[in-house]
Amino acid sequence: KLYGPSGSGALYIRQDRMEEMQPFMGGGDMIREVSREFVSYNDSPHKFEAGTPSIVEAIGFGVALEYLMKIGMADIQKHESKLKVYAEKEFENLDWLETQGNAPDKGAIFSFTMQGAAHAHDISTIVDRRGIAVRAGHHCAQPLMEHLGLNATCRASFGMYNSTEEIDQLTSSLEFAYELLG
């Protein structure tokens, strides 16, 4: 997570791979020359930058990166790792909470369901009304959900701005939701 404005981000592509790739959309500044018979693209990376760039988002993304570098990525990772370990221990105490994706090196993101008939959207609504924001749905991963035999999960993401107290608040809210729905 890089905390930039919505729609901002970066993609690294090795130079040799970039030369092999063809643009998948068209627009200004990516084309060197165009006629009815052919199109000649600008050199990389410009041939992939169609249309008007998102200038404000790029500036905001740069400021976000400067902020992260000031804090220090190692310190952020250490904090998020502590939150992950804390949340794992808290969630293990909820025997009715089923977490998905428990790879040892995963980030501080938890997808979960409750045993029983509770739907992820119902869980997220109850948790939200208690001041905790989680996502609910298929998270743009419908084939994975189908493979797991699920129609939706709730997802909680912890970052540099979160605390163990907020994990406690989430845990308490999940217990409340389970009392209502479980």
Where are these regions (language model features)?
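Pyridoxal 5′-phosphate
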Residues: 1-182
